[in-house]
Amino acid sequence: MKKFLMVLIVTPGLLLTAARAQDKKGAAAPPPATDTAKKKPAGITDKVKSCRKVDGLFTLYQDTANGSVQLYVKKSQLGKEYIYQSFSISGPNQLYLNQSMHRATLVFKIEKAFDKLEFSRVNTRFWYDKNNAVSKTASVDKPEAVFLVEKTVGEDADGYLISADGLFISEKLDPVKPLFPPGIPPTAIFNLGMLNTAKSRYANVRSFPNNSDIIVDLAYDNPAPYNSGTSDITDARYVRVRMQHSLIAMPENDFRSRRDDPRVGYFSQFINDQTSISTVPYKDIIHRWHLKKKDPNAALSEPVEPIVYWVENTTPLEYRQIIVDAGLKWNEAFEKAGFKNAVQMKIMPDDADWDPADIRYNVIRWVSSASPTYGAIGPSFVNPKTGQIIGADITIEWFSGSATPIFDELFKGFSATGNLQYPGMDPQHEANCSLANELKGQLLTGMTVLDASGASAMEVKEMHKQFLVYLIMHEMGHTLGLNHNMKASQMLSPAEINNTEITHKIGLIGSVMDYPAINIALDKSKQGDYYTTMAGPYDMWAIEYGYTPFSEGEEADGLKKIISRSTDPKLTFGNDGDDMRAPGKAMDPRVNVNELTSDAIGYAEDRFKIVNQVMSKLVQKYTKEGQSYAELRTRYGVLLGQRFGMVSAVSRYIGGIYVDRSFPEQKSATKPFTPVDLATQKRAMDVLTKYVFAPNAFEADAQVYAYLQPQRRGFTQNGTGDDYRITDNLLQVQASGALSHLLHGATLQRITNSRLYGNQYSVASMMSDLQKGIFNADIATNVNVYRQYLQTYFVRQLVAMVNPQSQQFDDVSKASALYTMKKIKTQLATAVSTNEETKAHRANLQFIIENALENK
């Protein structure tokens, strides 16, 4: 107690003394420096002393002993936005991880949070008018996407050092491994195993003033794979994928975004105006290069920076000049936009000291993959905030670009791999990959027809040259920002398509961005061009829209004037979203692949005749001394593929709707939706009946069947035999090409709905015509094998439609299916069956129908 009192007594004295001392000196003594002064950064020298320094946009340090990489982030780089772009350099073809695949494109930023650096993705899908008060909520309800947090391992006066392995030896930026779809057996699809970071490594680290490239080999392990993949997979348990991460400075220039328009086809960035009251609050912007005139006042001027493409030294020597000439053909289109020599083509020297994978170079390369998933591809990558194209590459597969036939079966059915989901790939890049063998199939069709007709080697060479020019121009069009125009093949009539006085002026089709059928004349003496070899009217118009320079005040009116010409039939447009290549997809039959002319039905009829003519010459032409029958089998598959393409084109006119996307002020002669007229729908059905459903539709093929033998290779024969699956493949032409679309729920409902605004072909009438085409011709005779499969398939489809549990069909369709089944039952009851096979077949049909009716 005494001690306590002493403290109470002494303490005031001490305080009083301290106060007097402060008054005397006029200021308090500074506190000890060790208590409050900020510690100086320890620096990064010790952390990077065993590393190779790579200077550039971002400074990287790679440990020379273990290969690990550290990233130095300057304080001035915090909060800034950068572009990330990933590329696959080498990997499984069937997973779209092969060379030069452009994958993830995004904007990211780096911010400091205490002792860590946060990497987050920036949402570029919204726009706010800054003059609107609601713009203050721009960041509300848009969750941050922080994909990496790393603790700083060093700091100096200018920046922070972190480990970069978690950023690059990972799937943080690009989820490389595709997602396995539910419901698909794991044995059906090859996929990667789990990422093994211990076995992954850096292949190259380079950095430049405006971009840093980090190339990594990511190792995936799967100790017990269900599917061993295709021949390019050395060992399905262990797969390495080479990827390139590119960190790119946000361009700082006077580039001005250009708005998208639904009447012309550019790749675009979707942006919603969150302060708009419009019913379509879109501020979508197109992808285009930054072209500026050297002389802004000149009607035609060279650009300050042209678009330069390098033909890589992997390109076969005999094709290099053709590619250069093809690329330069785009300059005619750019002249419509006021630019001279906008595109430049150069050939990469064999001793070049630069890497074609460097994003500063736009490269056209050739590769020869083991199992190519595409014929050629021309992706580009952009600034997502503005749409400015930053770089591009074109890759051509030897399989597609060469004039050499590949001895494999080109006519193949459904592949489960197509159902994989690719979260790391931009959807627009993925769309570029969806067409695989069509181009090669068309070229081989032309070569087969020329061979069978005894054409000279020069004629075949000219066909391939035209094909290659078209192919290069098509892929280059993608790199200029253009997406597909699957409606351009409708430009010329059958009477015009082989008139070179017309085609050498405006092209064979309206745009090189279509995937048309190769042009082959039924009468060889009238043959014109096989492929279009110039920018078409649509291409020139599209480039004019995308690249014509305008001042900010003049742009809206200038673009309106250009786009107002969209009603010109030569400028018609429809992209992949509009095309009808798949059963039940879309609605305008003029937007399709593998067809040609404004009368696609008539052109298809001629192609059926050509195929039947060539069938009679296949065995003689491709029975060659010293080789097996593998080539004959391939050629037959190519011709069967032609039939499939034509069936898919003709069948779409039944229940089709012509679409006109013009705006009201254009005063188009047609309505937005116009049902295909009854006569055209009936004509399409007649062509299908004659060339696809009739008992003699495949009569010409019979002489080929006994020769369709593949070449044996080790013990790889089909376990159930090498014979060609004739009935399966022909039924696929009939069913997948026609019936799957005609009996699709979406098609049937559209037929009924369009009755309310002009369609005169009802579901009941259409099914009645199908029933007649599939049953009437042989109702009083024996039924051949083709027809047995066809009739059984048709009846089973009707049974599936009337099933009460089915939710795919509307009531009108169900009623028509039931009525058609009962008509078939009545037909069968009085049919004449003169052999046991036909009796058995018809008894089976009656059993299927009766069983279905009893269970309803």
Question: Where does each model-flagged region fall?
Answer:
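Bacterial Sec-dependent N-terminal signal peptides
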Residues: 1-24
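Auxiliary tRNA-acceptor-end handling modules of aminoacyl-tRNA synthetases
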Residues: 24-315, 333, 337, 348-459, ...
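The catalytic-center signature of Zn2+-dependent metalloproteases
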Residues: 39-40, 347-367, 466-522
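Soluble non-cytosolic domains of exported or imported proteins
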Residues: 64, 101, 280, 313, ...
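Amphipathic alpha-helical segments that form well-ordered structural scaffolds
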Residues: 322-333, 471-475, 642, 646
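Sec-exported extracytoplasmic/periplasmic mature domains
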Residues: 328-339, 477-478, 482, 518, ...
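Conserved structured catalytic cores and adjacent interaction surfaces
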Residues: 343
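Conserved catalytic/binding loops enriched for acidic/polar residues
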Residues: 458-459, 463, 489-856
